[in-house]
Structures are given as structure tokens and as C-alpha cells.
Amino acid sequence: MPSALAIFTCRPNSHPFQERHVYLDEPIKIGRSVARCRPAQNNATFDCKVLSRNHALVWFDHKTSKFYLQDTKSSNGTFINSQRLSRGSEESPPCEILSGDIIQFGVDVTENTRKVTHGCIVSTIKLFLPDGMEARLRSDVIHAPLPSPVDKVAANTPSMYSQELFQLSQYLQEALHREQMLEQKLATLQRLLAITQEASDTSWQALIDEDRLLSRLEVMGNQLQACSKNQTEDSLRKELIALQEDKHSYETTAKESLRRVLQEKIEVVRKLSEVERSLSNTEDECTHLKEMNERTQEELRELANKYNGAVNEIKDLSDKLKVAEGKQEEIQQKGQAEKKELQTKIDEMEEKEQELQAKIEALQADNDFTNERLTALQVRLEHLQEKTLKECSSLGIQVDDFLPKINGSTEKEHLLSKSGGDCTFIHQFLECQKKLMVQGHLTKVVEESKLSKENQAKAKESDLSDTLSPSKEKSSDDTTDAQMDEQDLNEPLAKVSLLKDDLQGTQSETEAKQDIQHLRKELVEAQELARTSKQKCFELQALLEEERKAYRNQVEESAKQIQVLQVQLQKLHMDMENLQEEKDTEISSTRDKLLSAQDEILLLRQAAAEAVSERDTDFVSLQEELKKVRAELEGWRKAASEYENEIRSLQSSFQLRCQQCEDQQREEATRLQGELEKLKKEWDVLETECHSLKKENVLLSSELQRQEKELHNSQKQSFELTSDLSILQMTRKELEKQVGSLKEQHLRDAADLKTLLSKAENQAKDVQKEYEKTQTVLSELKLKFEMTEQEKQSITDELKQCKDNLKLLREKGNNKPWPWMPMLAALVAVTAMVLYVPGLARASP
């Protein structure tokens, strides 16, 4: 069964490694090389100190046909398109990766001791499905601009701002790569220029040698002509003097021309040294620009990370604010409901208190009225007792006499009725019977009232036990008790009125005494009921006061808590404002740094363009000067005739001057090395400053973490932060505007770089064409030089032969006059002419 394939290719800004082809049959571990696992082309193990041993995992999900990457608690982090997967050394959720993504393992780490930077692994990944088709690209995905985790999509999806920053960083990296290629091209062009200069020097030397040979031939021809002529000593002397004068004039002209050539050569060397210096300066500036670009990229990444962190913090704060607002609303609603309930309870208790006070006053008035009536009744009862005693004493005897008669038959009654007895006595007897019946009825009523009172007392005791229940039940029980008390008070009054009527109708002493006793008992019970009602009223008043005090205490405590919360909210507002000011200052400082860096980049670009233009002008001027020098040399060929010894002396002096120039160049090289050492020292100082800035950054980050902890602790107690959200949203909009301006500036810079690159490429093409032309010219000159050397050798051989012949002739002439002398001179002249004419023909073109 075929398996999915992942190809890791090295980026220019990465630690170097070979291209890896990894088959994803199972989850593949990405990490640092160890003794057991060495880097190979079919694994994801890298020889890099920045990576962890178990840095990350890559696998292919056959169900979803997607590729996933997970950071397994690495120390320096894993990045997908400049977005870190996890915070700190935490395990990240699996994140989807697409073909063409740029994956970074770790970050660049510098050692303080050796001051060596260890690069990280940056690679572009190409993903192929098991069927051989390439996975979808990042540009094909519309909804998700960056890879999202499986579980937490919203938490790890970066914003469009970070994606644009990543694109800008990619453009800058490509521009740096192009600059490196241009620098390499410039270096090759410089080498070609050096080669052409050497070739031109050799060609000049060949031309000088050719002119030298021609001058020798002319001299030899003149000598042959002079020897062939039969002249006297005076004429020979004159010719020798003229020849010596010509020789001196030629020497002076040659010396002047050589001086001019030397001066021009010195100027050319000086210009070349200046060009080399400008080249070194431009290279230094390019390195500085690269470093500044890297720093700006790092700062942009840090700003992007900070921006994403601030966005996440804002989201967390908004969520917490919403939760806090909901809790606050719930608490406020609960407080308002409790407040309303307490107010209603207080109002009800006050109303009940007023009602109870009114009832107490009414009961007191009724009690006073009943006391007055009871006193009046007591007086009447005393009068009635006296009357009844008198009547009972008179009637007691008559009743005893007539009892057997009453118990007798009806016949006796009939007889009595028929007899004309005393009617008044019978009426009195009947009235006594009625009174006895009334007394029995009264006793029954009294017993029933006693039973009802006992039941009421038991009910009151149960009600008193229930008074410890809530205030609503107390108030209802109190009202029922008051009603029962009123009924109890009204009942004895009614009974007293009935008893009055009965006592008025009845005049028995025993019944009156019993009624009086019952009335006294009822009065005592009524007084006790009044006392208990008063005690209940006092208890209710005490409970009301206690509840009022408790409510007041609760209100005071709530007011204090509200004040404390308001103070804490004010403190939180102040802290948030301070943090916002610090963030604004940091953002403004970073903006200033970016602007200054951009200005420096523009200045350096202008300087580089000026240097390139100066190089072009210098190159053109050098070419023109070379043409002039060639023309002058051609003129010197025709006019100059030199001797070998003088030329050798001039060559020696020229060599001495060259050695002096070389010594000067060495001194300049030593001076440049000293300047390099100074620059290295300055670089060390800058590195120390960078380390100090990093330490300050670490301290600032720790302070930020501490402030974040304080914010987290204060967020638990805060409930109102809506104003801060609006301010943060305004700052976010400002940041987005500034980011847009930065993007426009970066795009402009990229366009300028592209134009400069196109110009440089055109210049390189022109230089290549000129180089090809110079190569063709050099090849022709080399051929001519070889031909001239061959001719030179032949001529030197012939000249040696001629010299030998001349020496022999002179010796013979000194010894004997030789008759074949003119013939021999003519022969030598003819041979010289034959040899000289083709040389002139070759030299003339």
C-alpha cells in the first residue's frame, strides 16, 4: 500500500541540511541527532543544536486525508508560517499543515562565551498524498489563512496582520538572496576586470617588446648603411655625434613617456584601490543592512507575537468582563429583590405594629370600661343579695310547707284551684320554680363557658409556642390572638348583661354568689389575657427593633463593600491606563526604530547606487584612457628607438617602483586590517549592548508577567471594565492603520529593490558583453604576441649572426683591407630589408 510523502527543502536563512524525503507510514519524530539516531535523507533528524531530542511529530491521517504537526514540549518552539504552535515548553494541539508551508524548528541562539550564533531549521514542506497527488496549497484555502488545530481552532488561528507580516518577511528574504547573488556577480566581474587588466598589461608589454625589436632593426639597418658607405673619419664622427644627439633626444622622450605611463599607472592603481575600498565599504554596508533587516524582521515578529498576545488578552478580558457583568447583574437583581422583600417585611411589620398598638389601646379602653361596669355590677349584686336574702327568708317557710302538696296528685291541685286559695301564694311558688330552672340553665351556661375558656387557653398556649416562627406567622397569630381576646372580653360582657337580666328576674342568694364568683373569675381571666397580649406586643416590638437593627447593619455592610469595590475598580482603571501608556510608549519607540532603520536602508541604497554609478563612470574613463594610451603607444612605436641596456635599466627602475607600489598596498592592507580590528571591537561593543538590551527585555518581560498576574488577580474582583474595552479597540484600530502604512512602505521598498536589481542585472549583462569583447581582443593579442615572439627569436638569432660577422669583419678590417667588404655590407642590408619589411607590414595594422 503506498504511503504519504513529506519533502523538507532547506531555506536560505536556515541551518544547512540535505533535502529530506520522509514517508509517513506512522507518526515520524522530528528532533536533534544523537548516537542512536543519525541524520539521513529518509528521516527527520537534523544535526542542529537548537532542536530538542523529541522536538515535534508529523503524521498523515488516512480518515481525513490531512497532514498534522504537533509540538512535543520543545524548548525553542515550532513555527508554521512564523506562528508558534505552543506557549513555552507546553505540548501543542495537533495543527494541520498544507503543501508549501514554511516550517521552522527552534530559533537562532547565540552563545555569550564564544559569541557564536547557532541557526535554526527553516524548511519549505511539500506534501504528497498516497495516490501521488500533491496536497492542497495554502493559497487554495480561503477560510483559514493559517493552519488551525483540531480541537482549538479559534485559539490558534492567527490574524491577517501576521500573515501579511510573514509575506513581507518572505519578500525581504528573497531580496536578500537576490542581493547575495548580485554580490557574487559583482565579485566575478571584479575578477574578470583583474584578468582583463593583467591581459592588457601583458599586451602592452608585448607591444613594447615589439617596438623595441623594431627599433633595434632600424638601428641595425642604419649601422649596416653606415658600414656599407665608404666614408671618412670626419663624416663618421659627424654621424656618430648626430646619432648620439638623436640617442639623447630619444632617451629623453622615452623617459618622459615612461614617466607619464608610470604616473598614469599609479593613478590607475590608486583608482583601483579606491574602487576596492568602496567595494569593501559597500560590502560592509550590505552586511550591516542585512543585520538591520534581520533585526527588523525579528522585531516585526516580536511585534506580531505581542499583537496576537494582546488580542488574545483582550478576548480573555472581554469574556471575563461579560461573565463579571452577568454576575454583577445577578447580584444586583438579588440585592434589589432582597431589598424589596425586606422593605415589604418592614412595611408589614410597621403596619402590624400600628394595628397592635391600636388593638392594645382598644383593649385597654375596653378593660377600663369593663372594670367600671364590674364595679357597678358588684354594687348592684350587693343590693340584690340583700333583697334576695330578705325574700328567701320569707319564702323558705312557705316552700317547706307546700312541697308535699306540690308532689301530690293532680286532684289536690284541682281542688286547690277550685278552692278559693290564695292566688298570690301560688304565683310566688311558680316564680320560685322558674328561678330554679333559670339557675340550672345558668350553671350549664357557666360550665360551657369554662370548657370553652379552657380550650381557648390551650389554643393560646399553642399560639404562643408558634410565635417563634417567622414574622408573617407571628403577625397573623397576634391578630388572631387579639381577635380572640376581644371575643373573650366581649363574651363575659354579654354574659354579664344576661346575668344582670337573669339576676333581676331571679332573686336567689346562691345564684347571685355563684354568678359573682364566675364573673370575678372571668375578670381575672380577662386581665390575664390583657397582660399576655401586652407581653406579646412588647415581644413583637423587640423583634421588630432587632430586625431593623439587622437590616441597618446589612445595609451599612453592603455600602462599605460597594465603596471598597469602587476603590478597587478605580485602582484597576489606573493600572490599565498605566499599562496602556506603557504599551503606547513601546509601540511608539518601535515605530521610531523602524522609521530610523528604513531611513538608514534608503541612505545605504542611495550610497550603493552612487557607488555603482561611480564605478561605471570610472570604468568608462579607464577604457577611454586605455584607448588613449594605446594610441600614444602606437605613436611611440613609430617614433621611438631605444637601446637594450637603457630599457633594462628602465625595467629595473620600473620593477623597483612596482615593489614600492606593492609595499604601499601592503601598508594600506595593514591599515585596513587595523580598521577591521577597530570595526570588530565596535561590533563586540554592539554585541554587548545587544546582550544588555536582551537582558533588559527579559526583565521587562518578567515585569510584564508580574503585571499580568496582578491583572489576573484584580480581574477576579473587578466587575466593570467596559470603558477599557472601548479604549483597547481604539488602540487596535490605530495599530491596524499603522500596520497598513508599514505594509505600504515595505511594498514601496520591495518595488525599489526590484528596480535596483533589474538595473544591476542590466549592468551585469553589459559588463559580460564587454568582457566577451575583451576576451576576443585578448585572444587576438595573444596570437600576435606569440607571432612577435617567434619573429623576435628569429631576429635575435640573425642579429647575433650579424654581430659575429661584423666583429669578424672589423677584425679583418683592422688587420687588412678586405675587398669584399662593400659586397658583404650590401648583402647584410638586403637581408635586413627583407626581414624588416614584413615586420613593418605586420606591425602597421
Curated annotation (Swiss-Prot):
Associates with the striatin-interacting phosphatase and kinase (STRIPAK) core complex, forming the extended (SIKE1:SLMAP)STRIPAK complex. The (SIKE1:SLMAP)STRIPAK complex dephosphorylates STK3 leading to the inhibition of Hippo signaling and the control of cell growth. May play a role during myoblast fusion. Residues 28-85 form the FHA domain. Residues 1-819 are cytoplasmic. Homodimer. Interacts with myosin. Interacts with SIKE1 and both associate with the STRIPAK core complex composed of PP2A catalytic and scaffolding subunits, the striatins (PP2A regulatory subunits), the striatin-associated proteins MOB4, STRIP1 and STRIP2, PDCD10 and members of the STE20 kinases, such as STK24 and STK26. Interacts (via FHA domain) with STK3 (when phosphorylated); the interaction associates STK3 with the STRIPAK complex. Residues 167-202, 231-388, 506-816 form a coiled coil. GO terms for cellular component: centrosome; endoplasmic reticulum membrane; extracellular space; FAR/SIN/STRIPAK complex; M band; membrane; mitochondrial membrane; sarcolemma. Alternative spliced transmembrane domains determine subcellular targeting. Isoforms 1, 2, 3 and 4 are targeted to endoplasmic reticulum membrane as well as mitochondrion membrane. Isoform 5 is not targeted to mitochondrion membrane but to endoplasmic reticulum membrane. The chain crosses the membrane at residues 820-840. This is Sarcolemmal membrane-associated protein. One of its GO terms (biological process) is negative regulation of hippo signaling. Residues 1-163 are annotated as: Necessary for targeting to centrosomes. Expressed in proliferating myoblasts and differentiated myotubes (at protein level). Expressed in myoblasts, cardiac and skeletal muscles. Belongs to the SLMAP family. Residues 841-845 are extracellular. It is a single-pass type IV membrane protein. It holds the Pfam family FHA. InterPro entries: Cent_Immune-Sig_Mod, FHA_dom, Prot_inh_fetuin_CS, SMAD_FHA_dom_sf. Residues 451-463 have a biased composition (Basic and acidic residues). The modification Phosphoserine is found at residues 148, 465, 469. Residues 451-484 are annotated as: Disordered. Its main location: membrane. One of its GO terms (molecular function) is protein-macromolecule adaptor activity. It is found in: Cell membrane, Sarcolemma; Cytoplasm, Myofibril, Sarcomere, M line; Cytoplasm, Myofibril, Sarcomere, Z line. Keywords: Cell membrane, Coiled coil, Cytoplasm, Cytoskeleton, Endoplasmic reticulum, Membrane, Mitochondrion, Phosphoprotein, Transmembrane, Transmembrane helix.
